[in-house]
């Protein structure tokens, strides 16, 4: 697992992006072991544009929600990313019987969907 990177230093005239991952709602949320989110920036051919980042394990699990409440800082300025890039979010958890980490679901935001403020993604 790779950790969340620190916020990059500001660059004059460039736009930096930080995304707060608050929670994910799943009907069987309490059953997932060591759940976390992986965030990756990829080009239009799904080629990684920077190293992926993993949130720490969720801070809380309830009946139908898993709470992360973590900020992820994209390490490149928006202007330096190629047209058509997207930010991918993968919900992962540990499966003890198989002794591996599994991806349960994922979603992505395309470049033209980025905006300031809250955004809910369907995974």
Residue ranges and their predicted role:
Residues 64-101:
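Eukaryote-biased detector of low-complexity, proline/serine/threonine-rich segments
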Residues 8, 86-123:
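C2-type phospholipid-binding modules
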Residues 50-58, 73-78, 110, 123:
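Low-complexity, flexible helical/coil segments
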Residues 10-14, 43-47, 61-66, 80-83:
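Helix-boundary capping/turn motifs
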Residues 26-31, 40, 44-49, 80-83, ...:
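Eukaryotic short linear interaction motifs
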Residues 17, 35-37, 70, 87, ...:
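Hydrophobic residues positioned within well-ordered beta-strands of beta-sheet architectures
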Residues 1-41, 74-79:
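C2/C2-like lipid-binding beta-sandwich modules
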Residues 47-63, 69, 104-106:
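Short Trp-Ser/Thr-centered turn/loop motifs at beta-strand boundaries
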């Amino acid at each position: 697992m790779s950790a969340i990177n620190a916020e990059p230093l500001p660059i004059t005239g460039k736009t930096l992006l930080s995304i707060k991952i608050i929670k994910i709602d799943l009907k069987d949320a309490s059953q997932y072991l060591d759940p976390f989110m992986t965030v990756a920036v990829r080009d239009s051919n799904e080629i990684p544009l920077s190293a992926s980042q993993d949130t720490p394990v969720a801070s809380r699990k309830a009946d139908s929600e898993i709470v992360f409440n973590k900020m992820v800082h994209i390490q490149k300025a928006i202007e330096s990313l190629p047209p058509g890039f997207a930010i991918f979010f993968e919900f992962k958890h540990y499966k003890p019987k198989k002794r591996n980490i599994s991806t349960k679901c994922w979603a992505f935001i395309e470049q033209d969907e980025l905006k300031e403020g809250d955004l809910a993604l369907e995974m």
